[in-house]
Amino acid sequence: MDLSYTVGMSRYILMSIQTRYAEKIFRGEKRWEFRKSLPRHSKDDELTVVVYSSGGDRAVIGEFRVGRVMRCPLDELMRLTGYDTDEQAVQWFSRYYAGRKQCGALEILASVRYDQPISLSQLRQVLPAFRPPQNFRYIWPDSDLAAQLSEMSAICPDILSKLSKPRH
C-alpha cells in the first residue's frame, strides 16, 4: 500500500456518518460535517468523502465534495460556520469538543447519492476482512477497497483513475 502523500491530488476518504446526518447531507440540509479529527488535507487537494451510513442501512450510499477544511478553536469554528448565534448549538458543540484546543469541520459543497447503495454485506462478500471505519479511512488508489468501490459504484466507476492522477 502506497502511503506517500503528494499535494495537489484528488483524495478520497471513506467516512462513517450516522444515518440521520447522512440523510441531511443528501437532502442538502447539512452544510458542515463536524469532526474531532480530520484527514490530512492540503488546500491544493481535491477531497471527496465517500459516505458509509452507519445506521440500520449500513451501506456506502453516496459521496460529497469538500470545500473548506476548518481546524481552529471552537469560538472561531462557530463563527466561521454560522453557528455562533445559536445558543443550543454552541452548548452542544462545547460538549462535543470538550477539552480540545482545535476543532474540525468539513464544508459540504456538492453531494451525490448513489443509485445503488453498496451494502456492508456486499463489500464483505468480496473483502471479507472489511470493517467500516470508526471515523474515516483513506481510500488508497492501489487498495482492494478502491477497486471494489470502483467496480460496484454506478456514480464513480473510474474512482481508480481519479485517485491516482494529479489535478491540473
Go through each PLM region and give its residues:
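Short conserved beta-strand and strand-loop elements enriched in small hydrophobics
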Residues: 47-54
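Contiguous surface segments at macromolecular interaction interfaces
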Residues: 2-13, 17-43, 56-61, 69-168
